[in-house]
Amino acid sequence: MDLHSLLELGTKPTAPHVRNKKVILFDTNHQVSICNQIIDAINSGIDLGDLLEGGLLTLCVEHYYNSDKDKFNTSPVAKYLRDAGYEFDVIKNADATRFLDVSPNEPHYSPLILALKTLESTESQRGRIGLFLSFCSLFLPKLVVGDRASIEKALRQVTVHQEQGIVTYPNHWLTTGHMKVIFGILRSSFILKFVLIHQGVNLVTGHDAYDSIISNSVGQTRFSGLLIVKTVLEFILQKTDSGVTLHPLVRTSKVKNEVASFKQALSNLARHGEYAPFARVLNLSGINNLEHGLYPQLSAIALGVATAHGSTLAGVNVGEQYQQLREAAHDAEVKLQRRHEHQEIQAIAEDDEERKILEQFHLQKTEITHSQTLAVLSQKREKLARLAAEIENNIVEDQGFKQSQNRVSQSFLNDPTPVEVTVQARPMNRPTALPPPVDDKIEHESTEDSSSSSSFVDLNDPFALLNEDEDTLDDSVMIPGTTSREFQGIPEPPRQSQDLNNSQGKQEDESTNRIKKQFLRYQELPPVQEDDESEYTTDSQESIDQPGSDNEQGVDLPPPPLYAQEKRQDPIQHPAANPQDPFGSIGDVNGDILEPIRSPSSPSAPQEDTRMREAYELSPDFTNDEDNQQNWPQRVVTKKGRTFLYPNDLLQTNPPESLITALVEEYQNPVSAKELQADWPDMSFDERRHVAMNL
């Protein structure tokens, strides 16, 4: 026994087994009416259960074989399905005119029968069957990517067909809910996918508009999810007149081993014959041996070479450790192209003048192709960013009402007079107090559950992008934990100084982890420039690697003061802009009309004039002086160069403008900027300070 064959054991079936599955077909003298009722049941959202596959196959038999069972039984479609383990059971009822009449009268079908009794169908057109099948075929090209991409692709195709006057679909078919139902059916039904693909490839006569759409969709589905196969065959295993030659970049021994393994996987895939290009859609055997991760170096080199040749389909993401290899392959292939073109020009040019003209033309052609490729890739990146932003906004909107209800209910539990939380209902003589951090995370909600991911793509990187065939949100470059509202702090009434002294240590321990988690949501931002890494490779990088460290340790800030407003406004005439803001809508109030007052529940503040002295620059290295701690407000400069007025800017309902500007312009991440604005009202003062000093 060859010992090296141990590496291949378990990759090929030694005792092939096919699971048998029974499919029910329906045979009546009113087949068109039955088929229309099946379509109506699907469009109404009725779960046909075990009858779904049989109903879909009945539609296909009616459309392609005019319900001729003998012709269908002798067709290659039926033979392939039988070999795949499907058994056909025909229910005959010659007089049946409704789908309800041919449904099996068994106990587990009783919910379906009740639903079908309420179903009314007025359509009895045979063309509607082809219309429905052609509509289903629109979901095939992006079926392996996801529902969002598949629905968007289908809508684009619908628009094209309507503009060309080929087919017009009913408006209620184009709703998101209905299209998600069709996507789910197509994703789970092997029979429907197989019949559409088989007929789309082999139907050569009798085409109508519906068959034309199906053939077009099937053509776009070829090699869907098999980009590595397409790129390797086109650019790595180069076919020449003398045979197949390897690309020069993969002639090293280690990559050659991957090429040999890949050839073996391709030979196994080729056994599926004409269905091999659709192996990912049909989930055929051997498809798992063609993953990018099994051939990391070959995949990275192939994608880099394909991008150099102007292929925008090669925009999938590779492993982070192989990203540099991909870029190196891209650069090397560009140089090789120029060298080959130069050699060809030298061979075909008759004189120096012609050689110069040809060289200039090829140089311009290469630059134009490269710029156009980058432009298309940039559009895909922007599309991905917009798509991710829409998804995050939908998540926030869905959770917003529940979280606001939770905040209101908890505020009534924590404080019998919750109206005192907001500015508009505070008593005239009661000071505004900043509450200690309160952990009001939703019950049973873990950090993983409460955090989702948002997409960020580096605009300076021509490779970090989404491919038309592989643009899944799961594979995109994600930044973890950017949209959740983990902290829903509900302010408590001000405690006496004795209570604060007793619980100060406990509160500090509870708030430390929350502050660190809060900042972790904004610290994993990519560097502004790839060349300038000094800001991210020295002390600041170490502090990020060690969550226990504090980037604000050089700036010792005083505790938050208490302020009383000199100019009170009528709370009825001027309500707070945001009643859910635990700090009140201080909004446009500036430091000139604020006066620190003494309170037993906070550190005493020095008496000052009504007009505060000018804010002055506070360097990050200033020492822990009592004088410095008591001079409020102060202009603070963080290690990252952000400047804000402490504590006034942290008491506003919106984050300091310098933080928003940094996220949008410096980090080029407007998504995180919006999330910071959304999370700011829910943060405690310590959390706000931590984010401001470290961002």
From Swiss-Prot:
Biased composition (Polar residues): 495-505, 537-552
Molecular function via GO: RNA binding
One GO term (biological process): viral RNA genome packaging
Protein task: Encapsidates the genome, protecting it from nucleases. The encapsidated genomic RNA is termed the nucleocapsid and serves as template for transcription and replication. During replication, encapsidation by NP is coupled to RNA synthesis and all replicative products are resistant to nucleases.
The entry's keywords: Capsid protein, Coiled coil, Helical capsid protein, Host cytoplasm, Host-virus interaction, Phosphoprotein, Ribonucleoprotein, RNA-binding, Viral budding, Viral budding via the host ESCRT complexes, Viral nucleoprotein, Viral release from host cell, Virion
Gene Ontology CC: one annotated term: ribonucleoprotein complex
Coiled-coil residue windows: 316-341, 372-399
Name of the protein in question: Nucleoprotein
Description of post-translational modifications: Phosphorylated.
Record's subcellular location: Virion; Host cytoplasm
Quaternary context: Homooligomer. Homomultimerizes to form the nucleocapsid. Binds to viral genomic RNA. Interacts with VP35 and VP30 to form the nucleocapsid. Also interacts with VP24 and VP40.
Residue numbers covered by motif PTAP/PSAP motif: 603-606
UniProt entry tagged with the keyword Glycoprotein: no
Residue span of region Disordered: 424-611
Family membership: Belongs to the filoviruses nucleoprotein family.
Keyword Phosphoprotein: yes
UniProt comment concerning the protein's domains: This protein can be divided into a hydrophobic N-terminal half, and a hydrophilic and highly acidic C-terminal half.
Any Pfam family the entry gives: Ebola_NP
Biased composition (Basic and acidic residues): 438-447
